[in-house]
Amino acid sequence: MNSFIRPIEGNNTLWRYFFAFLVMVGLYVLGNIAYLFAILFTVIVNPNITFDLDEAVLSDPLVDLYLSHVIYLFAIPGVWLAVRFILKRPFRTVITPNSKMNWRRISFGFIAYFLLMIAVQLIDFVIHPDSYSMQEFNASRFIWLLAAALILVPIQTSAEELFFRGFLLQAFGRLTKNPLFLTLIVGGLFGVLHFANPEMNNGAVWAGIEYLTFGFVWTYYTIKTGSIEISLGAHAANNMFLCMFITEKNSVYGGIPSLFTVTRGNPMWEAFFTIAVNLVFAGIALWYHKKSKSKQQGS
């Protein structure tokens, strides 16, 4: 078992992991409370914006996109506090076992996954051109969207990576050394906790398969590469691409002013693309890790 799953530094007993988990949940709950107060304040100061009780979102999806990310401004400090003061080890240990983060690996994960997203979207456009339509372009709103995509979305994806493939993977690593079990447990939790997303309305079975695919594949190559650096980049690339370029009615991002809106047809086709992209990317990630490791050993 590599030193990322079983950190050498700190006090990593199970009871400490339990209390660390409680701290993270507590900060996450505080983030949600802050989000609710932000919604209330927005509705009071701007009567043109209302809160949709049925959808549990603001009437302006772009404003809601900004406010919802308040949650993750609490979540990441929650991970930091738990790791630093309960597990008694440096924060970087939920990212990498090395002495410092490797930004080249993060950048590689981002660029490789972003390019795969472009390729798959182009293929889908060629096959289903009628599903795509360009939204009416509003420069001011798109600039605000771009700022959110570049700054806030990576915070959200990093929070999820730190918690699931950082903290939880290491916590369950105290119980089992079997990489397959770890992949199923942590990847399964990641997928299942995304089942509340609006995409499930497009076809619950196939959307569920998509989320589980993300969970299983990303967790697997995190175990194999011994850090969350590549998945940090890949997760950010996936969400940033969707935020900037593609939106649909039944999605987490809803009616934000992305460049294109998509009307989904066959959910099975979407699941196929998701599986294909992630398997290809996993192969690329493992190849890159092996190549980098060989280069380090040869130097």
UniProtKB/Swiss-Prot annotation:
GO biological process per UniProt: CAAX-box protein maturation
Record-linked InterPro entries: Rce1/LyrA-like_dom
GO molecular function: endopeptidase activity
Protein name: Uncharacterized protein YyaK
Source species of the chain: Bacillus subtilis (strain 168)
Classification lineage: Bacteria, Bacillati, Bacillota, Bacilli, Bacillales
